[in-house]
Structures are given as structure tokens and as C-alpha cells.
Amino acid sequence: MKTFLVCALEPSANLHLKEVLKAYKKDFGEFELHGIYDESLCKEFDLNSKPLYSSHEFSAMGFIEVLPLIFKAKKAIKELVNLTLSQTMDAVLCIDSPAFNIPFAKALKKAGSKIPRIYYILPQVWAWKKGRIPIIESHFDILASILPFDNQFFNKSTYIGHPLLDEIKEFKNQEDINHTFSKKDDEKTIAFLPGSRRSEIRRLMPIFKELSQKFKGEKILCVPSFNLEKLEVYGDISEFKIESNTPKVLKKADFAFICSGTATLEAALVGTPFVLAYKAKAIDIFIAKLFVKLKHIGLANIFCDFAGKEALNPEFLQDKVNVLNLYEAYNKYDYKAFFAKVDFLKEYLQFGSAKNLAKILNEI
């Protein structure tokens, strides 16, 4: 039985990790897990061990919100390195979170650890800080990429498919699309996804609540399962139906208003027309503009940019996020252009990410 140390700090990283572990258990059998991950995985996979730290302790967004976690991260890295030196591990799997995982990989190498290091979901060097490329390539043995264009920047990355295509169980078909077109406006189901972090929710929910008054049909507020016990951050949500399964919400919805993040790509792949709305602290936006050189911030639009396609969906940022702009975008939406690009995205990204990574873990 193999033993892995994983670093999955973000909610999305744990969703991807869960699928990888499912694929591994199905194809190769039992395993042991150490490191940083969601405690729910212990019960799901009947693990004897518990995480050194729960992933919830490290969830933050923006340059300012991350600062208080720096000292905790340094302490965690030291403990993780000691763990790898004191116990037999078959591989270290780092998922996303470059601000943590790159220093961790450096610390492992400095300590003389010979355990193979895998990086799954690579840092977005195509957006900013390309200087990290040689550092990443010299501190990780395998770079498992989920973006087809990563190999334009990394010399040794291997594209293994995008995890969302495996995690989404239902996609809209032509019958679903025709059903949406046949509905009157007051019959349509509208989904609101204000993000998963407290800061995102607080900035977007007042606008989303006011916007929701424009719609007479069913209104769904998508709340991540780990936030279901913290509904007070959303304010008065009595007019919404609360659901937590993002792909199912998007499959059911005729249209969605979404905070920037993984959910925007989920909506595109499921086939639900949407508008992206994003508000951050002014200082975060200022710093981002200094370093990030991209036309768009939504993943689906970024993919379209790299492929030389027109943007898939409208994006509204900062003071442009208001009821008037969002409702106007809904009324003027180009559905035909959206659905044409959805088909392109599915072909572009490919299935099989979890299964391919499980195979790498088994063979290492």
C-alpha cells in the first residue's frame, strides 16, 4: 500500500484531490494519506490517519488576506518536511497554491528529501511571474498540467486533461437548450454564485440580492457545502432556494451570475449562459494590474484568448458590477455565440485528468 503526502489548501484543490483518490482506489487499491487536506476525505476513504492541518485553516484570497497566514505556513512547511524525513512516503503531491507549495518544495530539496514531487494544477505563469518557471522545474519531478497551453511555458509539463470534465456528471444537451429558449422570462431559473470566500460574498451579495428582484422565476443561491453552517454571511436570503452542488445548480439554471473562479468554467462546460461579476479590495486590484497582463479574468475567456477565439461571456469588474450593467448583459446575451464556444471548450480541454494522475501516482 502506497503512502502519499498531499498539500491541498483550497476548496477546489480538495474537490480535485477527491476525484484523484477515487480513481486511484478504483484502479490500484488502498493508500495512506498525510499532509494538508479536507478532513472529510478521512471518512470518505476510511483513512486511519488525519491531516496535519485542515485545508480550511489556509483558505484566503487577495494579497492582504494572505498576510496573516504567512507565519502559519512557515510553521506548517517545517512540520511537513520533518514528517517526510521521519516516515516513508512514496510521493509528495502538491495541488495549486504556489505561494505555499513552491516554498515547501524548496524546503524539501534543501532538507535532502529524495521523495518524488508532483505538481498538479500548475501556477499561472502565463498570467504573471514567469520567473518562477525554472524554480518550479528544478524543484518538482513531474508537472501535471490541466491547461493545454502550459507547455508553451514549461519545458517538462505533461497535459493530463482538465479535472472539471471528469467531475461534472451532467452536461446540457440540445433538448435542454431548446427548453431554455422556449421559456418566458418569468419561467426561467436564475442561479447566483457569489463565490466561496467571506470577502467575495460580502461584496457581491448586496448587488445579487437587488438584481434578483428583477426575476420572477425560481432563484437559486449556490452555497458551497462548507458554508452551509455560515449562512449569516449572506444576509437575508429568504427569497432564494439554497443548494450546494454547483454542477447540478448550473444544469438546472437557465442563466447564472457568477463570481470569478472555477464556477465560471463549470458553467461554460455544463452549458449554462452566464455573466462574470468580480469585486476585490482596491489594493488587490492595483497590485494585480501591475503584474497580471491578461485581457480577461474568467477561465473560459482566458482559454478562448489563448486559442484565438472571441470571449465566451461578458465580464464586469469593480465599480462596473452593478444591477444596471448585469441586468442589461442578461437582456442582450448572445446565446448562439455562447453555445458554439462551449462545444469548442470541451474538445480543447479533454477528459481523464483524475485517472491519468492516479496512474502517475501508482507508477512513480
Swiss-Prot record:
Record EC number: 2.4.1.182
Pathway this chain belongs to: Bacterial outer membrane biogenesis; LPS lipid A biosynthesis
GO molecular function: lipid-A-disaccharide synthase activity; phospholipid binding
Reaction equations catalysed: a lipid X + a UDP-2-N,3-O-bis[(3R)-3-hydroxyacyl]-alpha-D-glucosamine = a lipid A disaccharide + UDP + H(+)
GO biological process: lipid A biosynthetic process
Cross-referenced Pfam families: LpxB
Keywords: Glycosyltransferase, Lipid A biosynthesis, Lipid biosynthesis, Lipid metabolism, Transferase
Disulfide bonds: none
Origin superkingdom: Bacteria
GO cellular component, one term: membrane
Protein family according to the UniProt entry: Belongs to the LpxB family.
Function: Condensation of UDP-2,3-diacylglucosamine and 2,3-diacylglucosamine-1-phosphate to form lipid A disaccharide, a precursor of lipid A, a phosphorylated glycolipid that anchors the lipopolysaccharide to the outer membrane of the cell.
Protein name: Lipid-A-disaccharide synthase
Gene from which this protein is expressed: lpxB
